[in-house]
């Protein structure tokens, strides 16, 4: 279930806003597509990024994917636990699998993000295709 209190990007990152700070991670949809996450590259505290800027990467047993910041901001905290336990992204992408916290530089950036219902609609076709592929594998 996609949490309704978050905002989402087409690149499958999520943003939780709390005052002037935003918490960023990847969606459940993204972690399922990636498979088992084995490594995460995240920026240092103090780094600043424009909205849509690359802030790191996540490596899984399937692929390496770049991560993009949903809004412009300055990194104020990085989830250090992911260095030793990147699987938290798979286990709890909206909780203990968060990636970083940023001080928002422009609140207007959130206008380009999707609410949960719109994100669910955006990923619906992908989810159907995944279900078809899983059914084919089960019948093979």
For the regions a protein language model found, what residue spans apply to each?
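Acidic, low-complexity mobile loops and tails
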Residues: 1-54, 91, 96-123, 127, ...
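Small beta-strand-rich domains/subdomains or short beta-sheet motifs embedded
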Residues: 7, 41, 59, 65-70, ...
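Residue-level recognition of beta-strand microenvironments
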Residues: 15-17, 61, 78-81, 107
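Short, charged/polar surface micro-motifs in flexible loops or helix N-caps
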Residues: 31-32, 45-48, 72-75, 81-83
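A broadly tuned preference for mixed-charge, low-complexity surface segments
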Residues: 63-71, 77, 118-126
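Aromatic- and Lys/Arg-enriched surface recognition patch
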Residues: 76-100
């Amino acid at each position: 279930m996609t949490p309704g209190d978050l905002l989402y990007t087409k690149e499958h990152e999520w943003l939780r806003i709390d005052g002037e700070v935003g918490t960023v991670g990847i969606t459940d949809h993204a972690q399922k597509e990636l498979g088992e996450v084995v490594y995460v590259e995240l920026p240092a505290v103090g780094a600043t990024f424009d909205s849509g800027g690359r802030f790191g990467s996540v490596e899984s047993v399937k692929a390496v994917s770049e991560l993009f910041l949903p809004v412009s901001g300055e990194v104020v905290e990085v989830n250090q636990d992911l260095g030793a336990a990147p699987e938290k992204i798979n286990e709890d992408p909206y909780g203990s699998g968060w990636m970083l916290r940023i001080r928002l530089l422009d609140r207007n950036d959130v206008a380009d993000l999707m609410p949960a219902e719109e994100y669910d609609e955006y990923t619906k076709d992908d989810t159907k295709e995944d279900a078809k592929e899983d059914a084919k594998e089960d019948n093979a």
